[in-house]
Amino acid sequence: MDHITVPKVENVKLVDRYVSKKPANGILYLTATHLIYVEASGAARKETWIALHHIATVEKLPITSLGCPLTLRCKNFRVAHFVLDSDLVCHEVYISLLKLSQPALPEDLYAFSYNPKSSKEMRESGWKLIDPISDFGRMGIPNRNWTITDANRNYEICSTYPPEIVVPKSVTLGTVVGSSKFRSKERVPVLSYLYKENNAAICRCSQPLSGFYTRCVDDELLLEAISQTNPGSQFMYVVDTRPKLNAMANRAAGKGYENEDNYANIRFRFMGIENIHVMRSSLQKLLEVCELKTPTMSEFLSGLESSGWLRHIKAIMDAGIFITKAVKVEKASVLVHCSDGWDRTAQVCSVASILLDPFYRTFKGLMILIEKEWISMGHKFSQRCGHLDGDSKEVSPIFTQFLDCIWQLMEQFPCAFEFNENFLLEIHDHVFSCQFGNFLGNCQKDREDLRVYEKTHSVWPFLVQRKPDFRNPLYKGFTMYGVLNPSTVPYNIQFWCGMYNRFDKGLQPKQSMLESLLEIKKQRAMLETDVHELEKKLKVRDEPPEEICTCSQLGNILSQHLGSPLTNPLGFMGINGDLNTLMENGTLSREGGLRAQMDQVKSQGADLHHNCCEIVGSLRAINISGDVGISEAMGISGDMCTFEATGFSKDLGICGAMDISEATGISGNLGISEARGFSGDMGILGDTGISKASTKEADYSKHQ
């Protein structure tokens, strides 16, 4: 708060570059963590919150007719144009924002003051939620070829590696230490990912300190041991992610790349991914294109091309695809490095892991991958993201490019990822917000020195709580997609508008397909909740609906009301005995057509039984029971009666059209209606008595 000289400024305008009308006034607030702009007019009083650590640059422009302009460009690609009345106040706000956005000390970062009102136990469990070492257990490590060693527990081997590393089981500690002395920043070759299907491994390290002629026996032994963990292949790839010219230039400085003559059975490949300085310049050119107010198609496309951004994304993806094919198709292990092994190496190993393993396309998988390949393996988040006031030449969008590669894969395989675009954007926001401790410092040792596990909170529990917001509605499940084989032809590499233009809504913001799907999913969940509530109401009835809506119960009801005239027509007419026996004995000798009529009765009775079963099936399908009606939206009327289209009569009675002949002794009023309905009282309507004619016929039969 010492840097805030003007906490509140009135009559401030927030200019929208898409809106030509005069901007409305508002109030600008400066806090220790956020810049907040509140519109002074309007019923909603819209608020704009900008985290101070998101601010990349603050630019104070010359005074105009509107006032004193102040432009903020943020690391999450928001651009805010404010206009203040007073030049003096504008200057004070400008100085405050410069100091607040990039503090000099790590302890001044937001994470050390952020307090979500959780207990100490909750904070500690949050840090244990994602464990990168457990991922190696998922790969079956330790095993006969690989071991997890804590030889780096005091950071004696490599200060930028985690305390526990995975190395070949056959090598000695002396070999590992000797190899580390031959690698830049002591970043010795260690396991990144093991493809269990064929034991092919992806390992990572930094460039060797070979110069033109230097060699190291321990380093050669370690690479040979890595190769021998995969007996299914006679060679191992060594992938240098840099352009060959850059690697050769490093040789002159005593570094460089492996000499194939000194290493047994290796095949060397260059990937041509540019360094951090080229990437920083490329992003700057891209953002200049994004800030054009009314660009023509030619201006936008030519600017996008000249930035080279999509070419860099393609190069990273091509490298990941090469490693994937080497592991899956050629069954060969791969060792990956760049210069120091914490930028391009992290990008390429992560992309290859996502292509090979569907686990990394889930919420937990991506969080573990980021923790394992980026945080614990020493990506320099503090310097690359510009968290503190320091050398601007160390800032570079390396992690942003990694998320861009994931988004490119999501565009080509929309059903293969459990999370959606918003999950990537949320992670990107918190990498720069400094609200959580995960991305502070440049390595694991830095975070321990800062005591982030005691003083700050982990971002992963926060993201897990919001999983419903980040879930991909098109996700087909863990096992639907195996190894991904994306295309990197030019027309498949797209500009990620949702990242770089996410805050430019324009006059008529386009409707996001993802938002539409999520809204549909939300509405579906609400309807399912309504149905569940209705089902609970149905169970309140005294008699369970399934006891009413069964063929046996239906038959009992018919028997009670009719004496089973359909299933036993002779008994109903007062004739004892089986029909066939009576006919053979001549008992039923009246009229030759009587037997045919009785056969017809039995046939109709069987048909009725079948129809009853069909009706019961329909009742079960639409959950009809009791006096509780299902809403009119489902096509069912109030008193437990469906409308005519469902095929049930209003009174739910059995009546009329399918009369059994008078010879059977059942009146024409007793039958199955055209609608085949049942009464709400489950009773039988109409005259159930025996007609006069049929009674006489029955008496005549008795006399016979």
Curated annotation (Swiss-Prot):
Residues in a coiled coil are 515-541
The UniProt record gives the binding positions of a 1,2-diacyl-sn-glycero-3-phospho-(1D-myo-inositol-3-phosphate) as N250, N275, I276, S339, D340, G341, W342, D343, R344, R384
Q: Which reaction(s) does its UniProt entry say it catalyses?
A: a 1,2-diacyl-sn-glycero-3-phospho-(1D-myo-inositol-3,5-bisphosphate) + H2O = a 1,2-diacyl-sn-glycero-3-phospho-(1D-myo-inositol-5-phosphate) + phosphate; a 1,2-diacyl-sn-glycero-3-phospho-(1D-myo-inositol-3-phosphate) + H2O = a 1,2-diacyl-sn-glycero-3-phospho-(1D-myo-inositol) + phosphate; 1,2-dioctanoyl-sn-glycero-3-phospho-(1D-myo-inositol-3,5-bisphosphate) + H2O = 1,2-dioctanoyl-sn-glycero-3-phospho-(1D-myo-inositol-5-phosphate) + phosphate
Result when mutating K255A: Decreased phosphatidylinositol-3,5-bisphosphate 3-phosphatase activity
Q: How does it assemble?
A: Homodimer. Heterodimer with MTMR9.
State the family named in the UniProt similarity comment for this chain: Belongs to the protein-tyrosine phosphatase family. Non-receptor class myotubularin subfamily.
GO CC aspect terms = cytoplasm; cytosol; nuclear envelope; protein-containing complex
Q: Main site of residence?
A: nucleus
Species for this entry? Homo sapiens (Human)
Recorded hits in SMART domains, A to Z, give: PTPc_motif
Which intervals hold domain Myotubularin phosphatase? 126-500
Q: Specify the superkingdom.
A: Eukaryota
Query: Which keywords fit this entry according to its UniProt record?
Result: Coiled coil, Hydrolase, Lipid metabolism, Nucleus
Q: What Pfam family does this protein match (any one)? A: Myotub-related
Q: What is this protein called?
A: Phosphatidylinositol-3,5-bisphosphate 3-phosphatase MTMR8
